[in-house]
Structure formats: structure tokens, C-alpha cells
Swiss-Prot record:
UniProt organism field: Paraburkholderia phytofirmans (strain DSM 17436 / LMG 22146 / PsJN)
Protein name as it appears in the record: Glutamate 5-kinase
PROSITE patterns to which the protein is assigned, alphabetical: GLUTAMATE_5_KINASE (PS00902), PUA (PS50890)
Recorded GO MF terms: ATP binding; glutamate 5-kinase activity; RNA binding
Similarity section: Belongs to the glutamate 5-kinase family.
Amino acid sequence: MRSVIADSRRLVVKVGSSLVTNDGRGLDHAAIGRWAAQIAALRAQGKEVVLVSSGAIAEGMQRLGWTKRPREIDELQAAAAVGQMGLAQVYESRFAEHSIQTAQILLTHADLADRERYLNARSTLLTLLRLGVVPIINENDTVVTDEIKFGDNDTLGALVANLIEGDALVILTDQQGLFTADPRKDLTATLVQQADAGALELEAMAGGAGSSLGRGGMLTKILAAKRAAHSGANTVIASGREADVLSRLASGEAIGTQLIARTARMAARKQWMADHLQVRGHVVIDDGAVEKLTEGGKSLLPIGIVGVQGAFARGEVIACLSAAGREVARGLTNYSSAETKLIQRRPSGEIESVLGYMLEPELIHRDNLVLV
């Protein structure tokens, strides 16, 4: 089996906290130097590389003299602000040894949820790559809260892969890859060498929390691979402890787990809707509606809705759930949650008589709907 990285021209490489820090005691300058050297080698092969790097909070903790990761959001934000300075400085100096310019880009999910800012970020990144610069990206933890509590750079790496239409996402971690079960508890667990990025069984194999320094466990990596596949990007999850792992992957050596994007690449606008807009609520749909959405490519009509969850407004993104609770699709709703409750299970011809008006005959038009 040949590594998909060998034939990939544009890469997003995500490096976790444990691979750039001294077990939380500040940044590991030597390790960062090795990553810079490997990325420089990829550049020499004609590959474009965007680096998503953790480590800012760990570095900030070291500089502030903290030995434990704080729980308070404002303290995490302070650590991120202090640490981001050091992280950028070390990367800049290490890449300079290879005559490579770097650029620091701090993003939040809100940046990518706004269509204009999304396109601006895309334009900037593509320009930097054209100029031969290595963009170094991290979440802007100093101005957000949800990302610190629940976010992770695995997800950010996938979103960046979508943003720049990367060929592959490389997630480097302190684990060998995805196993069929937790190898610490099950001696029969084996490494999954290759699978479809959208395979449902992968989520069952994954799970568990990450380290005390990082935020992402294996499940976040599987979900990141699924997101990256929306833009046609393959994903490799591999151990950053492997010597020269990036160079070996680029040479064709199969290391870790390869998750292949089997589905057709989404149209750019639908990809943006699927991955960058926050879901504000849910509707439960009947089996007939599931079939029409997944097999017929139809719009979602009110008659197929059997339940409404959460509060949402017209124009927001909602998820469509099967009766079993599995997300089938998501899209931009034409009606609010209050309106949807009134028109659910009714044919479109009755919308006006119930509400006094009819905005659209569909709850979600197929042009604004994405299968997941």
C-alpha cells in the first residue's frame, strides 16, 4: 500500500501539543526544528504546506509559571495570548534556517462561518502559498470561549483543508493511528491501515479523551477526516514520534491510518454550509423523507417532519435527523422553529392557511441542503 501523501501536492499538516512541547513545560525547540526541516524537504519536492500547530497554551503556561492547565476560560485565554508569541517566534527562527518565510494566521470558527471572511481567508492563504510562504495557523483562543472548551485543532485542520482545497490532511499525534479497539485495554486490537473516511464503523472504533495538554481524542480525528473528505482531501493519522514521518510519507511509505475520500467533492458553497456554519437546531424526519433526501435528491417538505428540536430562525442551519437520531443532512431553513412546529406533518399547500403566509413551499430547498 502506497501513502496517499506521495501524490499529494497541497498538504495541511496538523501537529499536536505533545509533539511540540516538553510534556507541557514550554516549547520543545529541537522538535519544532525537526518539523521545520521535514516541511522544508516537502517544499523542495514541490509540495505546498500549511501547518496547523498547537502549543500556544502550553507555552503560555510555562512562561506564566503554571504547572496545571487552568480551568477558567480567562486564564486559558491569557495563557494562549502569552504563548502565541513564543510559538510564532520559534517557528519563524527554525524555518529561517531553511530560508523559508512563515506567516501567522489566527482563526476562529466565526471567521469561517462568515462567507466574506471565509473567502478573504482563502485568498490570503492561497496568495501566501503562491509566494512560497509557510502559513502557520492556530485557533485564536484569546477571543473565543467555545473553541477552548470544546474545539480542537484536528477540526481546524480539516476546515483549512477544505478552505484551500488541499489534497491531503496529515494529523500527527502521539498515537500510531486508529485501532479497531483501545490497544491499552484490548490486546487483540489491530491498526486500521486504510479505510473509507466516511465509514460509520470508524466512529465506534474511536473515542476517549485526549491528553491533559491537548484537546482532541481519536474521535475528533475521525470526524476531522470526514470533514476533509468533503473537499476531496484524504487524511493520514500517524505518530509524530516516528522518525522523519513526513519525509517517509512523502516517499510513499504507508505509516499510520489512511482515510480515503471516496465521495464526490462537494460544490464550494455546499461545502462551506456543511462544515463552517453552526447548526442551530434539529428536525426529525420520517423514513420517507430520509429516502427522498438521500436517494432522490429532493427538497425537505414540512410533511416529512415529525419533530422539532431547539430554537432557530429563518436562514439558519438546521440538521435533519432520522427517527433513530442519525444526522442525514443539514441546510438553510426557510422557516423558524416556531413556524416549523405549526406546519410539520402538513402538505405544502396548507402552509398559508396555517401561518397566514407562505415564504417557500419547502422547509429546506435542495440547493441549500447537504447530505452528511
